[in-house]
Amino acid sequence: MTYNIVALPGDGIGPEILNGSLSLLEIISNKYNFNYQIEHHEFGGASIDTFGEPLTEKTLNACKRADAILLGAIGGPKWTDPNNRPEQGLLKLRKSLNLFANIRPTTVFKGASSLSPLKQERVEGTDLVIVRELTSGIYFGEPRHFNNHEALDSLTYTREEIERIVHVAFKLAASRRGKLTSVDKENVLASSKLWRKVVNEVSQLYPEVTVNHLLVDACSMHLITNPKQFDVIVCENLFGDILSDEASVIPGSLGLSPSASFSNDGPRLYEPIHGSAPDIAGKNVANPFGMILSLAMCLRESLNQPDAADELEQHIYNMIENGQTTADLGGKLNTTDIFEILSQKLNH
């Protein structure tokens, strides 16, 4: 079997971190004996510059045919038209591929806890995953309108939309430490009342998982005061957007965090959580670990290569523990150095 991978370098530092990661993929495929082919497509601001829109039909169709999609980063101050922004292409891609589940791990690596803005003893050992519903909720609800006197957004969830994301979270929790925290605002929001009801019903199918409920404001506090208590957190779109960004600063650098977006039966999208960082683009100083860890998620989830994913992740953990990092993590290496060291390790 030959896996079909679509590469979307995007904007800013996206091309350099993605292209370096693809060089690692070539080494890994030879080592673990699997085949793949890459289709490169412009996306985001780069696509606006070339084609006048952030996501062309050609790119979208290629993504629909793919086994996996790797995205570098998109956006930047260059693209200011509110009706034609790079981020709109990403929203359209998620919706078109029905990428309803966003998986965001937050891990404080051994040897890197001093980088956290929180006390070391508070964050050491943190290993949590936020499962965010990605294609419904207030970002997509209708009706919506805006004028100078009034604005309206609609927060709507159906039972089916809640059930499918909650099943993803329960299955993930069952494969980890068996603890699921469901986040809502059940004390005031009707949508959250349905959310909590559905979570409780679905929990009966997963007796091995312990479930607790937290209001979103309480969860935001506990993420700071005791992040180690969490295993898997599941929440609706808006809450997940905020909480996952909050959690991402716990390790001390946005450059350490990967993410994946899943559908039930189509291609999956893998990307680091950081932005395009146009201020450092092309300077060979970007931290590529988030992109490489996203590649590891892709190896495990879409390319059926769990051993390769484990090896790649372990090499990264060892590098971080030994201080072999870029400047944002307190190290002295540049982007190219990171890829060269990993290439040497993988070739052994």
From Swiss-Prot:
GO terms for molecular function: 3-isopropylmalate dehydrogenase activity; magnesium ion binding; NAD binding. Substrate binds at R94, R104, R132, D217. It catalyses: (2R,3S)-3-isopropylmalate + NAD(+) = 4-methyl-2-oxopentanoate + CO2 + NADH. The keyword Lipid biosynthesis does not apply. The keyword Metal-binding applies. Its main location: cytoplasm. It is an enzyme of class 1 (oxidoreductase). The record marks Y139, K185 as: Important for catalysis. This is 3-isopropylmalate dehydrogenase. It comes from Staphylococcus aureus (strain bovine RF122 / ET3-1). The lineage of its organism: Bacteria, Bacillati, Bacillota, Bacilli, Bacillales. The gene is leuB.
